[in-house]
UniProtKB/Swiss-Prot annotation:
Entry protein name: Phosphopantetheine adenylyltransferase
Pathway linked to the protein: Cofactor biosynthesis; coenzyme A biosynthesis; CoA from (R)-pantothenate: step 4/5
Function: Reversibly transfers an adenylyl group from ATP to 4'-phosphopantetheine, yielding dephospho-CoA (dPCoA) and pyrophosphate.
Taxonomic source organism: Rhizobium leguminosarum bv. trifolii (strain WSM2304)
Subunit field text: Homohexamer.
Binding-site positions, substrate: 9, 41, 78, 92
Catalytic activity, EC: 2.7.7.3
InterPro entries per UniProt: Cyt_trans-like (IPR004821), PPAT (IPR001980), Rossmann-like_a/b/a_fold (IPR014729)
Signal peptide range in chain numbering: none
Superkingdom of this protein's organism: Bacteria
Any one biological process term the GO annotation gives: coenzyme A biosynthetic process
Residue sites binding ATP per the record: 9-10, 17, 93-95, 103, 128-134
Amino acid sequence: MTTAFYPGSFDPITNGHVDVLVQALNVAEKVIVAIGIHPGKAPLFSFEERAELIRLSLAEVLPGKTGDIDVVAFDNLVVDAARSHGATLLIRGLRDGTDLDYEMQMAGMNRTMAPDIQTIFLPAGTASRPITATLVRQIAAMGGDVSAFVPAAVLQALTSKRPD
């Protein structure tokens, strides 16, 4: 069984992340969605909230495939975390050339540290290309409509986080 590791902050999960996950399930039988925990960062959503939003979002889009996806936390090197979960593929989504330049550098470093783990780049769909979780948080915090950028469960969670 091929296992893929899809790391990110997912704060929150966006339609772009979901798009990449759907594609990832076409190249791997199992996908580990790995939420990075960084002590120096103050995320909008806790790990538990992000994990639940990922599960709810995927249940909307992939009702029959949720058993093929695990959600975990990690706070170490991506390749070490991937290896500890038995993953041989590292999934990275690409929106544009800027992402590609950065991700190619990371893929090279990861390949040197873990030659047994292959990085797979999956392009974001046209509709999800401009979406970033940072922009979603900023727009939502200012009362903007982010419904085109996030799954319904995330929209509801963002609305509940907004001060009245």
